[in-house]
Design a protein with these regions (language model features):
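Aromatic/basic-lined ligand-recognition segments
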Residues: 164-172, 180
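Beta-rich nucleic-acid/ligand-interaction surfaces
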Residues: 146-167
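Local beta-strand/beta-hairpin segments that build beta-sheet-rich folds
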Residues: 17, 167-168, 218, 222
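Short amphipathic alpha-helical segments
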Residues: 30, 34, 75, 121-132, ...
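Long, positively charged amphipathic alpha-helical accessory segments at protein N-termini or as interdomain linkers
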Residues: 140-142, 177-287
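N-terminal lobe of the biotin/lipoate ligase/transferase fold
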Residues: 1-119
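Contiguous, small/hydrophobic- and glycine-enriched helical/loop subdomains that border
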Residues: 107-150
Protein backbone atom coordinates (compact mmCIF):
# COMPACT_ATOMS: atom_id res chain seq x y z
CA UNK A 1 0.00 0.00 0.00
CA UNK A 2 1.40 3.37 -1.02
CA UNK A 3 1.11 5.70 1.95
CA UNK A 4 0.52 9.46 1.58
CA UNK A 5 2.98 12.07 2.75
CA UNK A 6 2.73 12.80 6.47
CA UNK A 7 5.01 15.75 7.35
CA UNK A 8 4.18 15.69 11.07
CA UNK A 9 5.53 12.15 11.36
CA UNK A 10 8.36 12.38 8.83
CA UNK A 11 9.79 15.68 10.08
CA UNK A 12 10.25 14.60 13.71
CA UNK A 13 12.70 12.29 15.41
CA UNK A 14 10.44 10.08 17.51
CA UNK A 15 11.11 8.37 20.82
CA UNK A 16 8.51 5.95 22.00
CA UNK A 17 7.56 5.04 25.54
CA UNK A 18 5.41 2.06 26.48
CA UNK A 19 4.24 2.12 30.09
CA UNK A 20 3.20 -1.56 29.95
CA UNK A 21 6.78 -2.59 29.17
CA UNK A 22 8.25 -0.13 31.66
CA UNK A 23 6.06 -1.23 34.58
CA UNK A 24 2.99 -3.45 33.97
CA UNK A 25 1.65 -2.47 37.40
CA UNK A 26 2.04 1.28 36.83
CA UNK A 27 -0.82 3.19 38.44
CA UNK A 28 -3.15 5.19 36.21
CA UNK A 29 -2.14 8.37 38.02
CA UNK A 30 1.50 7.65 37.17
CA UNK A 31 0.70 7.16 33.47
CA UNK A 32 -1.06 10.53 33.57
CA UNK A 33 1.97 11.99 35.35
CA UNK A 34 4.14 10.88 32.45
CA UNK A 35 1.77 12.74 30.11
CA UNK A 36 2.32 15.87 32.20
CA UNK A 37 6.07 15.20 32.28
CA UNK A 38 6.71 14.57 28.60
CA UNK A 39 5.18 17.87 27.54
CA UNK A 40 7.61 19.63 29.92
CA UNK A 41 10.61 17.45 29.05
CA UNK A 42 10.50 18.15 25.32
CA UNK A 43 12.52 21.41 25.51
CA UNK A 44 15.41 19.37 26.99
CA UNK A 45 15.65 17.18 23.88
CA UNK A 46 17.98 18.05 21.03
CA UNK A 47 18.60 16.47 17.66
CA UNK A 48 19.01 17.11 13.96
CA UNK A 49 15.23 17.35 13.56
CA UNK A 50 12.35 18.45 15.80
CA UNK A 51 11.87 15.97 18.63
CA UNK A 52 8.63 14.09 19.23
CA UNK A 53 7.39 11.46 21.66
CA UNK A 54 5.00 8.57 21.16
CA UNK A 55 3.53 7.45 24.48
CA UNK A 56 1.53 4.23 24.87
CA UNK A 57 -0.15 4.29 28.27
CA UNK A 58 -2.80 1.60 28.15
CA UNK A 59 -4.10 0.74 31.62
CA UNK A 60 -4.94 -2.88 32.35
CA UNK A 61 -6.69 -2.33 35.66
CA UNK A 62 -10.34 -1.37 34.96
CA UNK A 63 -10.21 2.39 35.44
CA UNK A 64 -12.21 5.46 34.51
CA UNK A 65 -10.11 8.50 33.65
CA UNK A 66 -12.34 11.38 34.66
CA UNK A 67 -12.20 14.88 33.23
CA UNK A 68 -12.34 18.29 34.85
CA UNK A 69 -16.07 18.70 34.22
CA UNK A 70 -16.76 15.35 35.91
CA UNK A 71 -15.15 16.67 39.08
CA UNK A 72 -17.96 19.26 39.28
CA UNK A 73 -20.84 16.76 39.28
CA UNK A 74 -23.36 17.56 42.04
CA UNK A 75 -23.25 14.07 43.60
CA UNK A 76 -19.70 13.17 42.61
CA UNK A 77 -19.11 11.01 45.68
CA UNK A 78 -22.10 8.81 44.81
CA UNK A 79 -20.82 8.45 41.25
CA UNK A 80 -17.36 7.46 42.44
CA UNK A 81 -18.83 4.98 44.90
CA UNK A 82 -20.78 3.47 42.00
CA UNK A 83 -17.56 3.00 40.02
CA UNK A 84 -15.95 1.30 43.01
CA UNK A 85 -18.96 -1.01 43.36
CA UNK A 86 -18.53 -1.98 39.70
CA UNK A 87 -14.89 -2.88 40.34
CA UNK A 88 -13.40 0.21 38.69
CA UNK A 89 -10.68 2.50 39.92
CA UNK A 90 -10.58 6.14 38.83
CA UNK A 91 -8.16 8.99 38.28
CA UNK A 92 -8.46 12.63 37.23
CA UNK A 93 -6.73 13.28 33.92
CA UNK A 94 -4.98 16.52 32.91
CA UNK A 95 -6.69 16.82 29.51
CA UNK A 96 -10.21 16.23 28.27
CA UNK A 97 -13.33 17.41 30.04
CA UNK A 98 -15.19 14.12 30.55
CA UNK A 99 -14.55 10.52 31.55
CA UNK A 100 -13.29 7.62 29.45
CA UNK A 101 -12.96 3.93 30.29
CA UNK A 102 -9.68 1.99 30.39
CA UNK A 103 -9.27 -1.78 30.49
CA UNK A 104 -7.00 -4.38 28.83
CA UNK A 105 -8.77 -3.96 25.46
CA UNK A 106 -8.43 -0.16 25.26
CA UNK A 107 -5.37 1.38 23.62
CA UNK A 108 -4.19 4.80 24.81
CA UNK A 109 -1.67 6.71 22.72
CA UNK A 110 -0.23 10.20 23.05
CA UNK A 111 1.82 12.21 20.54
CA UNK A 112 3.90 14.99 22.08
CA UNK A 113 5.80 17.65 20.14
CA UNK A 114 7.21 21.17 20.45
CA UNK A 115 5.20 23.90 18.73
CA UNK A 116 8.33 26.04 18.39
CA UNK A 117 9.69 23.65 15.77
CA UNK A 118 6.44 22.40 14.22
CA UNK A 119 3.57 24.86 14.77
CA UNK A 120 0.07 23.39 14.79
CA UNK A 121 -3.27 25.04 15.41
CA UNK A 122 -5.66 23.28 17.78
CA UNK A 123 -7.62 21.76 14.90
CA UNK A 124 -4.47 20.81 12.97
CA UNK A 125 -3.11 18.97 16.02
CA UNK A 126 -6.29 16.93 16.30
CA UNK A 127 -6.13 16.21 12.59
CA UNK A 128 -2.67 14.63 12.92
CA UNK A 129 -4.09 11.96 15.22
CA UNK A 130 -7.14 11.47 13.00
CA UNK A 131 -4.83 10.96 10.03
CA UNK A 132 -2.66 8.44 11.90
CA UNK A 133 -5.61 6.36 13.10
CA UNK A 134 -7.27 6.62 9.70
CA UNK A 135 -4.20 5.21 7.95
CA UNK A 136 -4.03 2.37 10.47
CA UNK A 137 -7.56 1.28 9.56
CA UNK A 138 -7.02 1.05 5.80
CA UNK A 139 -5.74 -2.57 5.96
CA UNK A 140 -9.03 -3.51 7.63
CA UNK A 141 -11.07 -1.95 4.85
CA UNK A 142 -12.41 0.69 7.24
CA UNK A 143 -12.86 4.39 6.59
CA UNK A 144 -12.43 6.71 9.55
CA UNK A 145 -14.47 9.87 10.03
CA UNK A 146 -14.19 12.49 12.74
CA UNK A 147 -17.28 14.18 14.13
CA UNK A 148 -19.14 14.39 17.41
CA UNK A 149 -21.21 11.45 18.62
CA UNK A 150 -23.27 13.36 21.17
CA UNK A 151 -24.65 10.32 23.03
CA UNK A 152 -21.26 8.69 23.53
CA UNK A 153 -19.20 9.15 26.66
CA UNK A 154 -16.73 12.04 26.36
CA UNK A 155 -18.21 13.36 23.09
CA UNK A 156 -16.14 15.79 21.06
CA UNK A 157 -15.74 17.32 17.62
CA UNK A 158 -12.97 14.85 16.81
CA UNK A 159 -14.64 11.63 17.91
CA UNK A 160 -13.24 8.71 15.88
CA UNK A 161 -16.12 7.18 13.96
CA UNK A 162 -16.43 4.08 11.78
CA UNK A 163 -19.73 3.22 10.11
CA UNK A 164 -21.58 5.79 12.19
CA UNK A 165 -20.35 4.41 15.53
CA UNK A 166 -17.64 5.81 17.77
CA UNK A 167 -14.51 3.69 18.29
CA UNK A 168 -12.43 6.27 20.14
CA UNK A 169 -11.83 9.87 21.05
CA UNK A 170 -9.10 12.50 21.17
CA UNK A 171 -8.04 15.08 23.74
CA UNK A 172 -5.37 17.76 23.59
CA UNK A 173 -3.20 19.56 26.13
CA UNK A 174 -0.77 22.44 25.69
CA UNK A 175 1.86 23.70 28.10
CA UNK A 176 3.97 26.66 26.99
CA UNK A 177 5.36 25.43 23.63
CA UNK A 178 4.60 21.77 24.33
CA UNK A 179 1.68 19.91 22.76
CA UNK A 180 0.21 16.51 23.58
CA UNK A 181 -2.57 15.00 21.52
CA UNK A 182 -3.93 11.82 23.12
CA UNK A 183 -6.40 9.25 21.84
CA UNK A 184 -8.11 6.19 23.18
CA UNK A 185 -9.17 3.39 20.83
CA UNK A 186 -11.68 0.72 21.85
CA UNK A 187 -9.86 -2.15 20.17
CA UNK A 188 -11.97 -5.02 21.49
CA UNK A 189 -14.05 -6.07 24.50
CA UNK A 190 -17.58 -5.22 25.58
CA UNK A 191 -18.15 -1.64 24.49
CA UNK A 192 -21.81 -1.73 25.48
CA UNK A 193 -20.78 -2.56 29.05
CA UNK A 194 -18.33 0.35 29.07
CA UNK A 195 -21.05 2.73 27.90
CA UNK A 196 -23.50 1.35 30.46
CA UNK A 197 -20.89 1.89 33.17
CA UNK A 198 -20.55 5.55 32.25
CA UNK A 199 -24.32 5.99 31.98
CA UNK A 200 -24.65 4.55 35.48
CA UNK A 201 -21.90 6.82 36.77
CA UNK A 202 -23.59 9.96 35.47
CA UNK A 203 -26.95 8.86 36.81
CA UNK A 204 -25.51 8.14 40.25
CA UNK A 205 -23.61 11.44 40.25
CA UNK A 206 -26.74 13.47 39.52
CA UNK A 207 -25.67 14.70 36.09
CA UNK A 208 -27.93 17.18 34.31
CA UNK A 209 -28.45 17.56 30.57
CA UNK A 210 -25.09 19.28 30.12
CA UNK A 211 -23.46 15.87 30.63
CA UNK A 212 -23.64 13.03 28.09
CA UNK A 213 -26.85 11.02 27.92
CA UNK A 214 -24.87 7.89 27.09
CA UNK A 215 -26.43 5.44 24.63
CA UNK A 216 -24.44 2.19 24.21
CA UNK A 217 -25.77 1.75 20.67
CA UNK A 218 -23.71 4.65 19.29
CA UNK A 219 -20.34 3.10 20.21
CA UNK A 220 -18.46 0.00 19.07
CA UNK A 221 -14.99 -1.55 18.97
CA UNK A 222 -12.44 -1.79 16.20
CA UNK A 223 -12.67 -5.59 16.30
CA UNK A 224 -16.45 -5.50 15.85
CA UNK A 225 -16.22 -2.92 13.08
CA UNK A 226 -13.74 -4.96 11.05
CA UNK A 227 -15.41 -8.28 11.84
CA UNK A 228 -12.27 -10.10 12.90
CA UNK A 229 -10.41 -10.90 16.12
CA UNK A 230 -8.08 -8.13 17.22
CA UNK A 231 -6.22 -7.36 20.41
CA UNK A 232 -4.65 -4.22 21.81
CA UNK A 233 -1.04 -5.37 21.54
CA UNK A 234 -1.28 -6.37 17.89
CA UNK A 235 -2.96 -3.07 17.00
CA UNK A 236 -0.28 -1.18 18.92
CA UNK A 237 2.40 -3.00 16.92
CA UNK A 238 0.64 -1.96 13.72
CA UNK A 239 0.71 1.68 14.83
CA UNK A 240 4.41 1.39 15.61
CA UNK A 241 5.08 -0.05 12.17
CA UNK A 242 3.03 2.68 10.54
CA UNK A 243 4.91 5.48 12.31
CA UNK A 244 8.20 3.72 11.51
CA UNK A 245 7.34 3.90 7.82
CA UNK A 246 7.69 7.68 8.05
CA UNK A 247 10.46 8.01 10.62
CA UNK A 248 12.61 5.76 12.75
CA UNK A 249 11.30 5.16 16.28
CA UNK A 250 13.89 5.06 19.06
CA UNK A 251 13.00 3.55 22.47
CA UNK A 252 12.72 6.27 25.09
CA UNK A 253 14.55 6.20 28.41
CA UNK A 254 12.31 6.45 31.47
CA UNK A 255 15.47 6.99 33.55
CA UNK A 256 16.70 10.00 31.57
CA UNK A 257 18.30 12.34 34.14
CA UNK A 258 16.29 15.31 32.89
CA UNK A 259 13.00 13.38 32.83
CA UNK A 260 13.17 11.78 36.29
CA UNK A 261 12.95 14.97 38.40
CA UNK A 262 10.15 16.31 36.19
CA UNK A 263 8.24 13.05 36.61
CA UNK A 264 8.76 13.00 40.38
CA UNK A 265 7.24 16.47 40.62
CA UNK A 266 4.34 15.76 38.26
CA UNK A 267 3.65 12.45 39.99
CA UNK A 268 2.84 14.35 43.15
CA UNK A 269 0.53 16.65 41.19
CA UNK A 270 -1.22 13.70 39.56
CA UNK A 271 -1.60 11.86 42.87
CA UNK A 272 -3.07 14.99 44.44
CA UNK A 273 -5.61 15.32 41.61
CA UNK A 274 -6.79 11.75 42.11
CA UNK A 275 -6.64 11.95 45.90
CA UNK A 276 -9.02 14.90 45.77
CA UNK A 277 -11.57 12.54 44.19
CA UNK A 278 -11.03 9.80 46.75
CA UNK A 279 -11.45 12.37 49.52
CA UNK A 280 -14.95 13.07 48.17
CA UNK A 281 -15.94 9.45 48.78
CA UNK A 282 -14.25 9.25 52.18
CA UNK A 283 -15.86 12.46 53.44
CA UNK A 284 -19.29 11.20 52.42
CA UNK A 285 -18.74 7.87 54.14
CA UNK A 286 -17.56 9.61 57.31
CA UNK A 287 -20.54 11.97 57.48
Amino acid sequence: MALPQFPYLSQHEWRYFDDANHDPALAASDSLAYQDSFIRWLPHLQGDQPQGLVHFYSIDRPTVLLGAKDSRLPNLAAGLAYLEEQGFDYALRPHGGLGVVCDPDILNIGLASDLTHFPLSIDAAYEQMVALIGLSLIPYGLELEAYEIAQSYCPGTYDLVVGGQKIGGIAQRRFKTGLTTAAYISVAGDQAARAQLMAGFYQAAGADDSYPQVDPAVMTTLAHACGQPLDRQSYQEELIQLISHYQKLVPGDYQDPDLVPIFNKMRQVSLARTQSLKSEVNSTQDS
